[in-house]
Amino acid sequence: MGHVVVKYKVTIDQPEDGSPDYEGIANTISSMEEVQACEIKPLAFGMMFIEVHAVLGEGEGIVDGFESRVREIDENVGQIEALEMGRL
């Protein structure tokens, strides 16, 4: 079974009280074993997103499972968009 490299754009929703914890969320994502790189980048109007590079095994439901685990990190994790995907 091969592996797939996926580059994600993870947006963080603005909480009602204060600003989002980009650093905390990025650190938690970085600690996931599939993640090779994780970086906070500017989006627009002072908002940021987290760019994630992950190496995932090939198979049915693996990509969806990874995305679900990222969503569970924090209630403010918004959209998770796969920007690029390729085989190793």
Describe these PLM feature segments.
Residues 1-88:
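Long, contiguous binding/interaction regions
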